[in-house]
Amino acid sequence: MTDTTTPTAKATDWAALSAELEQTLRLRSIPFAMKMFERREDMEAIPRIRRPSAVHTLDQVVGQASRLGWTVGVTAEDLVGAQCRAVVGLGGAKTDDWRSGRHMKGVWFEDDAGAAAHQAAMHCVPDGQFEALAVSPLASGRLGEPDIALFYATPGAMMYFINGLQWSGYKRFDWSVVGESACADSWGRALTTRTPSLSIPCFAERRYGGVLDDEMLMATPPEHLFRALAGMKALARNGFRYPFPQYGVQQDVRAGMAVSYGKD
């Protein structure tokens, strides 16, 4: 049986890893993977890859993987406008016009300065490195070793995942909220910094990508999934499991606290 608790296993059992993540966090949608490709031909060679027949936002493409279980590959021409392309570095989208934020002035930001500052604040993959991108359910393993793994979850589940990450080798997480174009906070940041990246999905993700109102998005290099799951197993042994049972707002708290922290 393949070891899914450490990244040192000879071959990752992506199906087992995905199933464990889904079960531990009670996920309502499919954990999925994202991978960048220097050549579109390599993306097109993925088994059972789907290619869009219409123009989409990347939020929609991501939704096809996380809600429908599809494996989808895109190039710059499949994505609407420069904003979607810029975050993942496709199509040389980061022109002076894009940096100005002109298309967002009066829509999301009051003036030129605010629109330009927003563009500058985004985490984006540099242009010129990649021709294509693919997303696929993590369990399928079709992307081989993906660049990042992603999943949607409730705030409570996200907090438990973070607790798992912080169980061993604690560090504080400081995440960004760029506002609209929040994909820059999730997959844009994870692809560029190679660190776990949590986001509050924006209007476009919810309107076009099918993201539910109570969902947040985690994007992370896959090795951090192993660390978080190991941490959550340790927390479970201490009695902390998701979903967290309600104790009651009028109860004497001492009995509950004593279970975790002992009696004074």
Predicted regions and their residues:
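Domain-level signal for soluble alpha/beta catalytic cores
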Residues: 3-6
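Acidic, serine/proline-rich low-complexity intrinsically disordered regions
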Residues: 10-264
